[in-house]
Amino acid sequence: HERLLGP
């Protein structure tokens, strides 16, 4: 997965 939590 990638950037599931945002910045």
UniProtKB/Swiss-Prot annotation:
Predominant location category: secreted
Top-level taxon of origin: Eukaryota
CC per GO annotation: extracellular region
Alphabetical keyword list: Secreted
Tissue: Expressed by the venom gland.
Annotated compartments: Secreted
Name of this chain's protein: Cryptide Pep-20
Organism: Tityus obscurus
